[in-house]
Amino acid sequence: MQERHLFTSESVSEGHPDKIADQISDAILDAMLEQDPQARVACETTVTTGLVLVVGEISTTAYVDIQKVVRETIKKIGYRDGQYGFDGDNCAVIVALDEQSPDIAQGVDDSLESREKDEDPLDKIGAGDQGLMFGFAVDQTPELMPLPIALSHRLMRKVAELRKSGQLAYLRPDAKAQVTVEYDENEQPKRVDTVVISTQHDEDVTLETIQKDMLEQVIKTVIPAEYLDDKTKYFINPTGRFVIGGPQGDSGLTGRKIIVDTYGGYARHGGGAFSGKDATKVDRSASYAARYIAKNIVAAGLARKCEVQLAYAIGVAQPVSVSVNTFETGTVSEEAIQTAIRENFDLRPAGIIKMLDLQRPIYKQTAAYGHFGRTDVDLSWERLDKVDALKASIAKLNH
């Protein structure tokens, strides 16, 4: 049993340079999938002052005006003004996309199992790469996410809402939030110890105004009052000034916010990024499947906290390993849970794609404010439609 301790997670806004890159990569992916659900996409984006570079490997029958997709995405985020050092109408966009390597394609199109004459059509697609992926759920919030990352995302969504609605017209698109939560010895969140918000702003607004607005209109409306007390510390724009931001302040790159995208460091991460990748890339699809499994396990009351690891070999359909850790919070054995997983979840790439309906243009909405625990959009891997099946499998094992 742990003693009382602190844990910190961060989130960044949709106007953060790395997140601009993620959103551009996923907007291109969505545009391809809209025309060609079978599109193979691995799309990486770099953004810097006045420039966007899009590279990667794409095999598709779709025709997409990539320049237009890039510019629309940037403008929608809020970079419409040349004085921000980056704007959707005037930045340069360089596109350098190749086809998927035929050596990779042959293993994805025709898995080891289907080459060895297995007749199951879901064995046809091999994993697009080797790798390991983690999914996680914990009963700290209604959406079964760790509290620090959940609060950090909510703060960032609120800041964006106040900016886009014009209520706080001095806000600019780039922002970051960080929340430190104090846990008791039973790993239950007790209070928020520290909140950090840094938000880009216009030249003529005072630091006092920003600090007051962030405290009253963001922090106190987002974080439940029972978590805040007179010892909670607030650091709002602690450098004193944040006028230069976005790609003018820092260059951005797809896949550099993998902890923000997942569990805020509260659970392990296999290292593979999500944005710009179609669902044959198990970095993305198997991470979604692992979250789906873990969330349904916790919702079914089989554990209060659950981490699922999946691992794959390139060109092979079946995962090479599936493991479960319930951190001694399980109501049944981990072995029983593993049996229930095998009975209820098809973890071959084609099985995951079918189970979660992943060949749709649904990805741009995941590219900011987290891929998991989202309450503002309907994501198939967040559904709790396997709870009864898991309970039934466990009941059957107990007879």
From Swiss-Prot:
Q: Which GO terms describe its biological process?
A: one-carbon metabolic process; S-adenosylmethionine biosynthetic process
The cross-references to Pfam families, in alphabetical order and at most eight, read: S-AdoMet_synt_C, S-AdoMet_synt_M, S-AdoMet_synt_N
Q: Where is this region: Flexible loop?
A: 100-110
Report the protein name in the record.
S-adenosylmethionine synthase
Please list the reactions this protein catalyses.
L-methionine + ATP + H2O = S-adenosyl-L-methionine + phosphate + diphosphate
Gene (name only): metK
Quote the record's binding site residues for K(+).
E44
| Native source species | Latilactobacillus sakei subsp. sakei (strain 23K) (Lactobacillus sakei subsp. sakei)
Specify whether Transferase is a keyword of the entry: yes
Q: In which pathway does it act?
A: Amino-acid biosynthesis; S-adenosyl-L-methionine biosynthesis; S-adenosyl-L-methionine from L-methionine: step 1/1
